[in-house]
Amino acid sequence: MGKIILFEDVEFGGKKLELETSVSDLNVHGFNDIVSSIIVESGTWFVFDDEGFSGPSYKLTPGKYPNPGSWGGNDDELSSVKQQ
């Protein structure tokens, strides 16, 4: 089982959302299009710009991603996350 932590602001600031399962629509958690930094504690995750695991995606392995450029994405774009 993996774990990913999404943050509202760059450098791991603001509200955070900890997940251990895939989420097809981050709006359910109030986190649609607001993610600006990520910590992957374990597992491999794909983050997607659109709901339903669609649109541009980025593969993330354990580590810290302090801003969208660190995973190759854009600020405030993520809408779904999927654990591999």
UniProtKB/Swiss-Prot annotation:
Residues 2-42, 43-84 form the Beta/gamma crystallin 'Greek key' domain. The keyword Ion transport does not apply. Disulfide bonds: none annotated. Keywords: Repeat. It comes from the Eukaryota. SUPFAM superfamilies: gamma-Crystallin-like. Residues 64-84 are annotated as: Disordered. Structural component of the neuroectodermal visual system. Belongs to the beta/gamma-crystallin family. Monomer. This is Beta/gamma-crystallin. It comes from Ciona intestinalis (Transparent sea squirt).
